[in-house]
Amino acid sequence: MNSIYKDDSLTLHTDLYQINMMKTYWETGVSEKKAIFEAYFRKLPFENGYAIFAGLERIVRYIEQLRFSKTDIDYLRGLGHYPEEFLTYLENFEFKGSIRSAVEGELVFANEPLVQVEGTLAECQLIETALLNIVNFQTLIATKASRVRMVSGNDPVLEFGTRRAQELDAAIWGTRAAYIGGCDATSNVRAGKMFGIPVSGTHAHSLVQAYRDDYEAFKAYAESHRDCVFLVDTYDILKSGVPNAIRVAKEFGDKINFLGVRIDSGDMAYMSKKVRQQLDEAGFTKAKIYASSDLDEKTILNLKMQGAKIDVWGIGTRLITAYDQPALGCVYKLVSIEDENGVMVDTMKISNNAEKVSTPGKKQVWRITRNSDGKSEGDYIALWDERPDQLDELFMFHPVYTYINKTVKDFTARPILQKIFENGKRVYELPKLQEIKAYKDEQIEALWDEYKRILNPEQYPVDLSQKTYDQKLASIAEIREEVRLKSEQLAKENAK
């Protein structure tokens, strides 16, 4: 076996340009400059009213194991781009920075910091790729699962996507994110072992095909399993599948726990009604109807509108792949950097595309909730030294349409970004997965129904403090003036 497969180092799970930038910083003597980066996404996924943050546990594990291994260094040496002195620098690399982040299960919104990294320029740069890779995927899947949960009501939702996921890691961590977002169990046995997620499963069409007969297959399954859910659509749902499931259930009686039947094809609304009728007429009124087959929140919503008699939803491909929007688009931007005098100077990216203009400065996100009922008034992005939690009233306004504003009184301001690492040491205790799921449910409950609609939700307020807003405008003007002067000087030099 190639020795590389025995090396579980994730340090090179990065883009080449991160290493190249580290080399540039190192050679020009700025690698130890202090810097602050913030990760955020620009648009909510699936046209949803919120997103559910997920991925922090894996970020923590990644940071705690962030070391260049011998095989990492040997590989980089083999590329022939890097001098030995730089490779020695990498070999001695340790993450000594600080990370603040939303906790898993937190509701998050567009254009607000989700993760904030403070440290040397080099170490902040190195972790960008892995951090975005983790947050982009897991937050996307958790949000998709929440949408499924929203339309499913109290019906059990099972995650069935492992075979359709984009490789092993996506299946495992996608399952975890789906559980946080709202799924009740998974078919993925490894995820059950790793994370304590309840596991659930029935059987495949191949079992029925192997016995060439619904009855023989169901009987064989019942002889080896007490809990039985029979897949009834291999040949003919109403003429063979369900009648033979009923036959086996009656023959075995109390020897098995006949949980119900699963439908994986056909007109789910029509078939579920007919199947329900057959089960009820046979006396199995408590038997459940399980449905699978490329389901998602839109299909479930429509099936419920059509009066489908489905009790349990098995969600696979369209959840684990985030089928209708397979990318979140989270970005990682430098917001402050140390100047030659050791002073932190705010910085930003400007663009002719308004949505790509970043907000400079080290910031905190505050969730503003009413004391009267605990409902959220919106999120308030402020510079780090601002303390809205110490104010009696708070003026909130839309960062683009400033005439949309309000003054909030009798409120609580809760900081969203929590300390995870301080000077390279973890200071945050990772909660149990069930605690994360319960926390997410609490946050959903605090959100107004208007923001939870699957179709055309109201836009949740994400406002800037006056100080943050003013600084952003001042920075834009300052950068544009600096660019203008330098471009004029460059034009003069080129004209010589």
Regions found by a protein language model. Name each.
Residues 2-33, 47-48, 295-496:
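Gly/Ser/Thr/Ala-enriched C-terminal appendages of enzymes
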Residues 2-34, 43-45, 81, 87-96, ...:
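Buried, small/hydrophobic-residue-enriched core segments of structured protein domains
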Residues 35-91:
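N-terminal, Lys/Arg-enriched amphipathic/low-complexity engagement segments
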Residues 36-38, 96, 157, 331, ...:
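A residue-level signal for beta-strand positions that form part of recognition/binding surfaces
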Residues 55-58, 140, 432-436:
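Short amphipathic alpha-helical segments
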Residues 59-66, 76, 89, 134, ...:
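Residues that form generic nucleotide/phosphate-binding pockets
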Residues 74-75, 143-147, 161, 452-459:
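Short coil/turn segments at secondary-structure boundaries
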Residues 200, 261, 289, 311-313:
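Hydrophobic residues within beta-strands of alpha/beta enzymes
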